Amino acid sequence: FYERDNIVKNYYKLLALPGRYAQSAEFIEIQSLLLECIKSIGDSLFKDGNVQSGCEVVINENEVTITAGRMYIDGVVRETKETKLTIKGEGVENITARIEETVVTEDEDESLLDQAVGSSSSFQPGCFRVKQEVVYEVDGEGYVVATLYDGALRNFIVEKPQMDVISEVLARRTFAE
């Protein structure tokens, strides 16, 4: 997959010209430019690991369950699946969240074949897909979302998004008036 480093060069958008071919790298570049713009807005409001909903930590002896929810990581609010982890229950243990990325082809997902029945590309392969999922681990490399001490929840890291703080300030000012 080809992608030029447009962000470093301060390129803002791509201009398609009549009579010229679009390159596959240019489709990837368009997506990257848009994702970077969205991420810059998201990063000004949220921190990686901010829980939007759910993602509660439930401890039952040496098993930790993190409920399904939504969490901001790497520029996107992501759906998370319920996850069960085994802990030692001794000392300090961190529950971390990270993104696991895989490339999906039409071999793994037949719905990626062209569905335009009757066309020359009918049931032909098209673009691969990049799949990103949130993976929880004990003492992993990701963002710390909870800290356990001797098997008990010591700190569930839920920092309020900047918009929540702004809303609270506005509510106090409105109430005071």
Where are the regions a protein language model picked out?
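N-terminal "first-domain core" detector
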Residues: 9, 14-53
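Beta-strand-rich solenoidal segments
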Residues: 1-16, 21, 26, 60-177
